[in-house]
Structure formats: structure tokens, C-alpha cells
Amino acid sequence: MSIESVTRLVRTLRRNLAEITRSLYKDSDYCIKPGYRSRVENEHHDDTGFRDEWQREVYVYAAELMQRERLASVIDIGCGSGFKLVSLLGEFETIGVEVPPAYDLLRSTYPERTWFHWTEMPKPGVCADLVMASDVIEHFPDPGDLIAMIQAIPSRYVILSTPERDLIRGKSDFGPPENQAHCREWNSDEFRRYASLHFDVIDHTITNREQGTQLVLCRPR
């Protein structure tokens, strides 16, 4: 078989696999409008080079919640470089969850803090007053995987943030997302409905209109 034939075969197999995967992960299951097309093969997003350029307001919101409700501990799933977690929530007991290369960087940069590899969670006996995932859910082919992890961690509050599709793409956008690392994006109504399937939503707000960041504050059921 020639190289050209092998290349065509690989492309066909990848295309067929993408269609099969898309049929398994129906966007209607995630409360997204009919006709929307998600991305089934997304790029890994390495944000170890970022500090607080994105989603800073989410961490400020979390800090204010913890102070107001006198919470003591937080688990940050997909904490990236850890800068926002340590700088804005450093007065509390923190646990960060990541994958390499971020996981290795976190352990070497902040050895005094607690870091878990994604595959370690949920970890028996590990709990927190607040579990948060800041702009993480849009990276999952099946966001139910993230939801299941959060639900398995005993907590009092949950914070989820994600891009507000209509703000950053316009109401006529039907995907896939422009960001190659995103599988799908929700508008405000869709995200609130999806979060409400799994948690009791007690607040839903736009934390940064320019960046199009929306946030839901929830209580576990």
C-alpha cells in the first residue's frame, strides 16, 4: 500500500471516528441549541504560562464567597499555573488538580501546597468547602466526566465558569468553537439549564463581559 493510500485511509478512519464520537456526545444532552456542532478532537490547552490574565474575576468571586461564608478549604480542578489559586485564595487551605506539564510545574513552584494529578481524583477522604473549575468544562468531550468528579467530592459549594458563547461568538454561532482547545461553548440560558441538571444553582452571573466569562454558583444535591 502506498503512502498516499495509507494517508487517505487514516483520514477516513479519523473522520468516521469523529462522527461516531459526535453521535455519542449529543449536544442536546448538554442543553445546547439544536444544530450546534461540537468539536470531538480538541487540542490540549497548556496554560502554565498564564498568571491572572484570564478568569481573575472568578477567583475574586470565590475569595469573597469564602470570606462571607467563612469557608476554610477549596479544591481547584484545572488550576493551570496555580498563580490565581495561590495569590487570590492563598489564605485558605488549597488543593489544585491538574495534568502534566502543569502538574509537574505546580509541584516544583509551590511545594508547600497540595497538588493532585487528575487521575488521583476523586481521592478517598479528600473534601473541601468549595470545589471550583474555572473555564475547564468546555475542554471535555463529555462534560459529564467533570460533573461526576465534582459530585464525588464532598463540598458545600461548587463554582463553574465557562465562556458565554453569545457574547464572544454572537447568537448566530453554531460551532465548533473558534478556540481549538474547546469542545463546545454554552450561552447563559443553556449553561444554567445544564448546571441545574446536576446542582442547585443559587447564582449565575457574567464576571467579565469583555472576556465573555459566565459563572454559576451551586450547591451539591
Model-based region annotation:
Residues 135-139:
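A short His-aromatic
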Residues 168-171:
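A short acidic, helix-capping loop that chelates divalent metal ions and anchors anionic groups
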